[in-house]
Amino acid sequence: MIQTTEINRPPAAVAQAIAPLLSVRNIEVVYDDVILVLRGLSLEVPQGTIVALLGANGAGKSTTLKAISGLLKTEDGEVTRGEIVFDGERINGIDPDKIVRRGIIQVMEGRRIISDMTSLENLRLGAFTRGDNEVGADIDMVFNYFPRLKERTGLAGYLSGGEQQMLAIGRARS
């Protein structure tokens, strides 16, 4: 069973007036067309809050995140019931790259930064299918969002663990 905990919860009156940024409504996830792994899962993430998914191994935390990110198909999984709504728009069934463009990014543990490449090269690697003009603005946004990544041309292997995680998040976004 997945437990959610809200941090920085807004006052009840404010929370009711604001539609949730992310809403997972009664989803069911099935792998290989027969293995039911989630049933009736619902959660809401109000704008400006942090929600933690807590649970034992095998409780469905990663599956929930993969469902939200659109990554279930890579493991023969699918959301067979319910809906996932982000910023007022239903996103289940949408390709993962389009979900990223809408602002949902999943970066798992294990940063997989290429240490012999620069920060800039690592970011460009995440956007290898896109044109330079389109990628440039996204890369600038990453460096603005993470000011600790001020050195674009330094080797990523010399970054701290936290900076490498920032770089991994930026690469997923670019």
PLM-predicted stretches and their roles:
Residues 32-33, 51, 72-75, 119-137, ...:
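ABC-type ATPase nucleotide-binding domains, specifically the catalytic core motifs of the NBD
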Residues 51-52, 106:
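Short beta-strand immediately N-terminal to the Walker A/P-loop
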Residues 54-56:
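The feature captures the beta-strand-to-loop junction immediately N-terminal to the Walker
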Residues 69:
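Helix-to-loop junction immediately C-terminal to a conserved catalytic motif
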Residues 79-89, 102, 135-137:
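Conserved ABC transporter NBD signature motif
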Residues 91-94, 142-158, 174:
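Conserved ABC nucleotide-binding domain
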